[in-house]
């Protein structure tokens, strides 16, 4: 045993062990072991879009608890880390940080700046992840913008293209006018906004007045029809008639459709191309004409005597309303609160434009994807409903085209050869990764092709995060098929609940389309970290917690302890009280270990080397046997909890045992025996020291997944030169059990509790001598009586069985 330092310095020790673990490759994956013994994790690659906050630490450490446990029970851990460093989120970071705009620069120059920024940001991420002791294998690190990742992402696209699951179409899509790009349904969020319901006067072709309510009067020039519900008796007489739009005097058909809400507005609706999803449905089902008046920049393009050209949407709305009022065509306005679909990143209200884009088929696979969600093991189970609700709500195929620069390009060109103009040309697998702006399709010259200028949605690459580590996509598209087959599908996907609709859904979709299989067997979903007042953390509120400052104040083990005290999937508020409890636990572990170690030199070196099961007969004392039985039960409960991803229950049970059973009771009760100053009971002394030796060792192992630094330091001082975190170092007591009557030891604890309360009530020292304890309701064995005398400072104890319930009469010295 090493010399025990006087104090535990978490700053020095955490840095020391992080360096040693890295140097000794404690967490390295062994590629030579069989597939059966591997535990494979699809670690979330954090988006390089800003500073990591405490919420990231919260979820990443929860994954690490499970990974460390799996390693300790003997699994060969494949635990990579990646950085999602391409796409719109990263571009927005670069534009903000460098005060530039991508569209004002040369494409290559902007990409170069992006690469420099992500390199610096990833160094910060990497350092923080090491500081909080994520036990990842850093040799498995990847970046989603790297040549290898681009190759795998382009392989995914080509595989789906060959399978007929990808198509290119000129159709309505969601468009962000601020970032100037198409978006997918998963990239939007609903926001409540104050608006006006405007009641506008239309006329029939015959001159009859019709009132139509709308929140988008600026779309009047794009009106292509008027609809009513077929069961609405107010408007059945309008069948086969036409309406004349106000101001623009365009003739449009009046049609019946069951999607009209009779109780909304006047029950008459104008269909414009396009205001919402319903407009698209009507446009398609009724074969209506297309009138596009909104540009990609969010301005109006509509030459007319009513001059709207070049106005923003908001400006056009105001102008239209003013003119309608002037001409007495606006009969009423009502202030309403409406749900507006906005871009998740820019926050801008979305428009629906008709643009040629690439899509992955999604709608046709909804039923199959719902079945997949049932095949997956969800932790916690209630999170499954979120994905099912999302799948059921889908109404668009996945648009994967983005009109940006820093992303994975489509491996596509369009032919300009005479006779095949517009023909889609795609890269050969041997060419990947390709940049169609610089590279050429086989057999074509630069003059014969136009490159696809778009890049893929960042989720199109993130959705193959497992494959970025396995180096394969499918039977036909793989860089290393042997590696892919060994590592795919994976065991675990850890992630936060807010990206179930994106990362979880898209990864399941891609895996289903590529190989008709789930990408992983289990998914553990973490909640959000909230501010102390339970509000969402945000920079505008000034309540965002910076992990680096907390690490300086408390250290990684304490932060990890706080994270472990939150149930999986729950949104949890940051708590200073829990942080203080964690700090208290670190100190108590140190002091308890230091206390019990005083006597470890009395144990033989042989007894220290072997498992407790091999020398169980040397635990001779009844109270020692009782705590070992309790310890064995704890190990089983904690193991079962961690196997079911219930890390919070595992640490709760372990901490409760440590404080209540081991420190507060066992160490106090057995202390006199351990010292055995008069050499009265050498067998009882050896039994208690051996018990403390194994209980402390077991507790360190149970705490190790949560608090890796303090447990490593104590384990190295007390037990072994090998790391506590090595593969296969979990506790396994098998069927170890001492056949004892628990009523005796537990009766002792009941009596002790009564005595402690008595002394506290009368402000007596815990060591205050007692002349006599008169105990009824139980009779203890001789060795338990000696322990009870020692811990209560009682001169004598008398027992009788006149009561069923334990009662104690305490007599003090006069």
Curated annotation (Swiss-Prot):
Residues binding ATP: 539
Subcellular location: Cytoplasm
Coiled coil: none
Protein's UniProt keywords contain Ligase: yes
Motif ('KMSKS' region): 536-540
Protein purpose: Catalyzes the attachment of valine to tRNA(Val). As ValRS can inadvertently accommodate and process structurally similar amino acids such as threonine, to avoid such errors, it has a 'posttransfer' editing activity that hydrolyzes mischarged Thr-tRNA(Val) in a tRNA-dependent manner.
Family indicated by similarity: Belongs to the class-I aminoacyl-tRNA synthetase family. ValS type 2 subfamily.
Quaternary structure and interacting proteins, as annotated: Monomer.
Protein name: Valine--tRNA ligase
Organism: Rickettsia typhi (strain ATCC VR-144 / Wilmington)
């Amino acid at each position: 045993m090493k010399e025990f330092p006087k104090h535990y310095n978490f700053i020095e020790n955490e840095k020391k062990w992080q360096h040693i673990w890295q140097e000794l490759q404690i967490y390295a994956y062994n590629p030579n072991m069989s597939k059966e013994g591997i535990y494979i994790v699809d670690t979330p690659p954090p988006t390089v879009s800003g500073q990591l906050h405490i919420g990231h630490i919260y979820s990443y450490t929860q994954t690490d608890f499970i990974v460390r446990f799996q390693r300790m029970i003997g699994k060969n851990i494949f635990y990579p880390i990646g950085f999602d460093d391409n796409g719109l989120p990263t571009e927005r970071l670069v534009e903000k940080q460098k005060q530039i705009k991508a569209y004002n620069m040369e494409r290559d120059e902007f990409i170069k700046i992006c690469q420099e920024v992500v390199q610096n940001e990833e160094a910060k991420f990497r350092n923080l992840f090491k500081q909080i002791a994520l036990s990842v294998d850093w040799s498995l690190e990847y970046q989603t913008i790297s040549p290898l990742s681009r190759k795998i992402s382009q392989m995914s696209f080509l595989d789906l293209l060959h399978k007929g699951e990808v198509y290119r179409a000129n159709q309505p899509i969601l468009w962000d006018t601020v970032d100037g790009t198409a978006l997918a349904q998963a990239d939007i969020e609903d926001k409540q906004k104050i608006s006006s319901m405007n009641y506008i006067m239309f006329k029939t072709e015959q001159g009859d007045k019709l009132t139509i309510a709308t929140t988008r009067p600026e779309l009047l020039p794009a009106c292509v029809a008027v609809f009513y519900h077929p069961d609405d008796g107010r408007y059945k007489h309008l069948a086969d008639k036409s309406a004349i739009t106000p101001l623009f005097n365009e003739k449009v058909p009046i049609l019946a459709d069951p999607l009209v809400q009779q109780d909304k507005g006047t029950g008459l609706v104008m269909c414009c191309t396009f205001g919402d999803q319903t407009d698209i449905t009507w446009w398609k089902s009724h074969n209506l004409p297309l009138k596009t008046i909104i540009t990609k920049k969010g301005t109006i393009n509509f030459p007319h005597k009513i001059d709207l050209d070049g106005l923003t949407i908001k400006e056009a709305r105001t102008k239209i309303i003013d003119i309608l009022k002037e001409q007495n065509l606006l009969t009423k306005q009502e202030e309403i609160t409406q749900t507006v679909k906005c871009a998740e990143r820019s926050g801008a209200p979305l428009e629906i434009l008709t643009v040629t884009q690439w899509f992955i088929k999604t709608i046709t696979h909804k039923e199959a994807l719902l079945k997949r969600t049932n095949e997956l093991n969800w932790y916690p189970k209630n999170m499954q409903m979120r994905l099912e609700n999302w799948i059921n709500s889908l109404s668009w195929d996945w648009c994967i085209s983005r009109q940006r620069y820093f992303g994975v390009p489509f491996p596509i060109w369009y032919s300009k050869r005479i006779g095949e103009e517009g023909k889609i040309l795609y890269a050969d697998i041997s060419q990947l990764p390709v940049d169609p702006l610089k590279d050429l399709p086989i057999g074509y010259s630069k003059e014969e092709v136009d490159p696809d200028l778009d890049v893929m949605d960042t989720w199109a690459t993130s959705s193959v995060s497992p494959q970025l580590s396995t180096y394969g996509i499918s039977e036909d598209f793989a860089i290393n098929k042997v590696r892919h087959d060994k590592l795919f599908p994976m065991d675990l996907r850890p992630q936060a609940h807010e990206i179930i609709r994106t990362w979880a859904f898209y990864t399941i979709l891609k895996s289903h389309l590529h190989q008709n299989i789930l990408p992983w067997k289990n998914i553990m979903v973490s909640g959000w970290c909230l501010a102390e007042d339970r509000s969402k953390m945000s920079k505008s509120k000034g309540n965002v917690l910076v992990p680096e400052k907390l690490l300086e104040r408390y250290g990684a083990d304490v932060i990890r302890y706080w994270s472990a005290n939150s149930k999986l999937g729950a949104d949890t508020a940051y708590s200073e009280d829990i942080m203080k409890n964690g700090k208290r636990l670190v100190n108590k572990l140190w002091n308890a270990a230091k206390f019990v170690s005083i006597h470890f030199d009395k144990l033989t070196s042989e007894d220290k080397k072997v498992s407790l099961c091999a020398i169980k007969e040397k635990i001779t004392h009844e109270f020692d046997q009782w705590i070992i039985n309790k310890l064995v039960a704890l190990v089983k409960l904690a193991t079962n909890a961690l196997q079911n991803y219930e890390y919070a229950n595992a640490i709760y049970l372990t901490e409760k045992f440590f404080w209540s059973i081991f420190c507060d009771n066992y160490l106090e009760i057995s202390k006199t025996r351990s010292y055995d100053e008069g050499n009265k009971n050498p067998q009882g002394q050896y039994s208690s020291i051996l018990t403390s030796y194994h209980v402390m060792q077991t507790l360190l192992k149970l705490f190790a997944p949560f608090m890796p630094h303090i447990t490593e330091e104590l384990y190295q001082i007390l037990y072994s030169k090998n790391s506590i975190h090595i593969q296969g170092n979990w506790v396994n007591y098998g069927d170890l059990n001492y056949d004892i009557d628990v009523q005796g030891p537990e009766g002792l604890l009941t009596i002790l509790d009564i005595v402690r309360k008595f002394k506290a009530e009368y402000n007596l020292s815990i060591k205050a001598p007692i002349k006599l304890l008169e105990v009824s309701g139980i009779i203890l064995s001789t060795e338990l009586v000696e322990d009870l005398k020692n811990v209560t400072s009682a001169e004598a104890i008398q027992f009788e069985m006149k009561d069923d319930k334990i009662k104690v009469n305490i007599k003090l010295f006069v």
